Each structure stands twice: as C-alpha cells, then as structure tokens.
Amino acid sequence: MASKQQRQALNNGINQIIDAMSINVSPVVIEVRSLTKKYNGILAVNCISFTVQRGSITALVGGNGAGKTTTLSMLLGLLLPSEGEINILGADMLTKRHLVLPRMNFSSPYVGMPARLTVSENLTVYANLYGLDNVKDRVTSVAKDLQILDTLKTQLGNLSSGQKTRVSLAKALINEPELLILDEPTASLDPESADWARGHLESYQQRTGATLLLASHNMGEVERLCHKVLMMKDGTIVDEGSPQRLIANYDKKNLEEVFLEIARNKTHSRDFVP
C-alpha cells in the first residue's frame, strides 16, 4: 500500500499534468487586463488591457518613459504588477508561470550576459537552463542561423555591440520558443545587419508559427514587421491597430508620422496617485 507521502506525490504529479493540459491553444496567446504598475506614487503603467493573437507579430510603441519596458518586464515575471491580470499561453502568470516559461524567451541588448564567458559558454548555459537535448548541436545550429559561428570561442565582452545583439537573439531562439518577447531587437546593428535580423525574425515566425511581441523605437521596422501596433504614452495605450489602419486613421504617410502626432498631443499625461 502506498504511503501518505507517495500518495501526495502522486496527487501532485497528477495536478501538474492537469495544469499542463489546461494550457490552451486558443487564438489568444497574451491577455492583459487592467495592468498597473506604480513606483513611488507614479503610474508607470496605468490600467492597460490588450491581447496578442497567436502567430502574430505585435509591437509596443512609445517614447522614452511610455511604459513599454515596464510592461514587458511584468509579462516576463521580472516585475510584479501593482494591479491587474496577465494570462500567457493559457496560464495565470502570477500563479502558474512555471508552466509556460519554458515555452517563452526574451531578447534585449540591455540585459547583460556574463562578459567573461565565451559566446558558446553563454549559449550553453541557456540551453541547459531550458533542459534541451543535444546542447552542443543546438548551440552550433543557432549560432550558424545568427551568423556568429566565428565568435563562439570569443569572450562576450570582446565583441562589438552589434555582435552582442546577435548573441542576444541567438540566446532568445535557443529553445525555439512559441512566444518570443523582444526589447529593441535590432539596437546597435548597422542598417544592413538590422535588415537581415528583421528578415530572420520574420522567417522564424513564418516557419514555426511563433508569436512575437516587440518594443521598438524604429517605426520603419514596426511598419514592415508587425500585424498590430499598441501605441503607448504616459503609461497608457492611447491607440492600437494595424500599421496600415493607424496610418489611414491619422491621415499620415507612414507610422513615424503617426508616432510624432501622438507624441505631440498633450491630451495624455501621467497621473499622480497617492
């Protein structure tokens, strides 16, 4: 007869399986409701709600301090929201994020990796964190895809900023995530390299059906890549839609002109809260 501890372990295992099976395959990958973040009485993110559809590329756009990075940090579980709900891949990120984090990844040129480790060592660390098989082959494969094979034995700290951006993208793709979150994915890349990186991300999305959410100041990049744009200002989402719809609604020539129109509109201002 099973002991009490064995029965408890079995029940825990069954509950984990049920939880994992409950992670849905609905058309909505990210659902955010009334998300708020306060810092010392200032609303950095002010009661925003939005959805991201499966297989789409969506952009968070806004000026410095608009709340983009804070929003991404809450989606990733790096910051706890002051209020609101975050549901990703069918899981409540406040209580069950362990079920979906293995299916996600993140890239930012502003989040450092150990500078004294080689590129290969850095990528190997992340491959092991995700519990991947054939780690050496996977590291080689993703390095080849990102055209950084010749840097594998080089310490990360000795690379140029553009090369580091490629390594960050390689790290983010190491586990072939269903959901890829990107903060300024082409920062520090020259125009030719940035164009190549955009093409690579677009190809990855088309090949795998992955969902991409990115924050960017590059309106040309957003206009080319994204199916949907969330325009942020002063911690709120002031407008959203496809690049084409936004351009038409504001009667502008391109998305950069829309961005400038919203940025110069004084209607929205960050609220102070006690």
Could you say what each language-model-derived stretch is?
Residues 155-159:
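Conserved ABC ATPase signature
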Residues 180-184:
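Catalytic Walker B motif of ABC-type/P-loop ATPase nucleotide-binding domains
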Residues 195-207:
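Helical segment within the ABC ATPase nucleotide-binding domain
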